[in-house]
């Protein structure tokens, strides 16, 4: 089959070999020669460094002031406990932060399943051992969980100021990425008479908070979003203009008829294309007195009616007319 020189092959087959719930191999073929390494390297970097996820960022343990302490009745020292908590696989559904509690006493292991969870927080590895207690062991701790991306050292976290943070709040270097391991391999592929094509095989393992197939899909979406700007160089990278919310008092949007003026005064205002109360209050006394057939008696009536509603003549409105009446031909004619 003859192909144009400008026409690139696109993958026809995506095969997912699910080894277990957290481990899968994804095969993509065929690819033009060289594209296996191009896409494989880019996806691998994103999967390892840029995937969003959740992790423990702060820990409070009763009776512990710093990470070099020990806890009576606990076999592990505090540093070991913190290292174990870094391996906690947490998933939050509808928020960016949560504070969880753990209270355990008596001999035996303290597991991730012993953590008291909120309704929208899950732990994917409930059998993970946090520490081990002796017969007189008693441990109480609070865990602050946050959502983030990639790897974040504790000293770069802006949420905790060293001077104001309470003593005993231990900060953790956090790896938010749900991807534990990823590798790729490029093999040969064939389509009809072409034998110089690539087949990309991605071997991926996650912590259980996301399945491997979804992880690759998210990584590909991130890559697509980053490359989209190169598609159209002429597109202006100006920030989108966000229209300020127009805060207009509802009374100003009401017609002048609602003021229940005399017929003479109402007709004079309409003759000057003054249809809304917002139009009226922006006129001055001098301007209204220039209106044909509108005398001082009518002017006094208008001022009194406006005053009863907390309004007056000569007021200035920044966003008038608002969008809701901007298309009104009567307003445009004023």
Swiss-Prot record:
Record-level Gene Ontology MF annotations: DNA binding; DNA-directed RNA polymerase activity; protein dimerization activity
Record InterPro entries: DNA-dir_RNA_pol_insert, DNA-dir_RNA_pol_RpoA/D/Rpb3, DNA-dir_RpoA, RBP11-like, RNAP_asu_C, RNApol_insert_sf
GO CC terms in record: cytoplasm; DNA-directed RNA polymerase complex
Coiled-coil regions listed: none
Superkingdom assignment: Bacteria
Keyword Iron in record: no
GO biological process: DNA-templated transcription
Short name of one Pfam family: RNA_pol_A_bac
Keywords assigned by UniProt, alphabetized: DNA-directed RNA polymerase, Nucleotidyltransferase, Transcription, Transferase
Group of enzyme by EC: transferase
Stretches the record annotates as Alpha N-terminal domain (alpha-NTD): 1-234
Catalytic activity line of the entry: RNA(n) + a ribonucleoside 5'-triphosphate = RNA(n+1) + diphosphate
Chain segments carrying region Alpha C-terminal domain (alpha-CTD): 248-334
Enzyme Commission number(s) from the entry: 2.7.7.6
Family to which the UniProt record says this protein belongs: Belongs to the RNA polymerase alpha chain family.
Entry domain remark: The N-terminal domain is essential for RNAP assembly and basal transcription, whereas the C-terminal domain is involved in interaction with transcriptional regulators and with upstream promoter elements.
Protein task: DNA-dependent RNA polymerase catalyzes the transcription of DNA into RNA using the four ribonucleoside triphosphates as substrates.
Subunit structure: Homodimer. The RNAP catalytic core consists of 2 alpha, 1 beta, 1 beta' and 1 omega subunit. When a sigma factor is associated with the core the holoenzyme is formed, which can initiate transcription.
Protein name: DNA-directed RNA polymerase subunit alpha
Species the sequence originates in: Hahella chejuensis (strain KCTC 2396)
């Amino acid at each position: 089959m003859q192909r144009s020189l400008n026409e690139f092959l696109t993958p026809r087959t995506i095969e997912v070999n699910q080894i277990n719930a957290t481990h899968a191999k994804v095969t993509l073929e065929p690819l033009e020669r060289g594209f296996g390494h191009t896409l494989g390297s880019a996806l691998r970097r994103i999967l390892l460094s840029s995937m969003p996820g959740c992790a423990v960022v702060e820990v409070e343990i009763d009776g512990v002031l710093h990470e070099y302490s020990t806890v009576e009745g606990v076999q592990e020292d505090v540093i070991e406990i913190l290292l174990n908590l870094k391996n906690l696989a947490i998933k939050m559904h509808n928020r960016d932060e949560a504070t969880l509690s753990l209270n355990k006493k008596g001999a035996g292991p303290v597991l991730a399943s012993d953590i008291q969870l909120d309704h929208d927080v899950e732990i994917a590895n409930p059998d993970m051992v946090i520490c081990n207690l002796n017969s007189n062991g008693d441990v109480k701790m609070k865990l602050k969980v946050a959502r983030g991306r990639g790897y974040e050292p504790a000293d770069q976290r802006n949420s905790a100021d060293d001077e104001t943070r309470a003593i005993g709040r231990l900060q953790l270097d956090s790896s938010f990425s749900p991807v534990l391991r990823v590798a790729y391999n490029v093999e040969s592929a064939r389509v009809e008479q072409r034998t110089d094509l690539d087949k990309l095989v991605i071997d991926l393992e996650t912590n259980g908070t996301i399945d491997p197939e979804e992880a690759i899909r998210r990584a590909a979406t991130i890559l697509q979003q980053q490359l989209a700007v190169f598609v159209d160089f002429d597109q202006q990278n100006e920030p989108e203009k966000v229209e300020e919310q127009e805060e207009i008092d509802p009374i100003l949007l009401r017609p002048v008829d609602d003021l229940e003026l005399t017929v003479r005064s109402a007709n004079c205002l309409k003759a000057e294309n003054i249809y809304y109360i917002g139009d009226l209050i922006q006129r001055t006394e001098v301007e209204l007195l220039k209106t044909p057939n509108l005398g001082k008696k009518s002017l006094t009536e208008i001022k009194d009616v406006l005053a009863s509603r907390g309004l007056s003549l000569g007021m200035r409105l920044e966003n008038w007319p608002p969008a809701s009446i901007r298309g009104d031909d009567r307003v445009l004619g004023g």
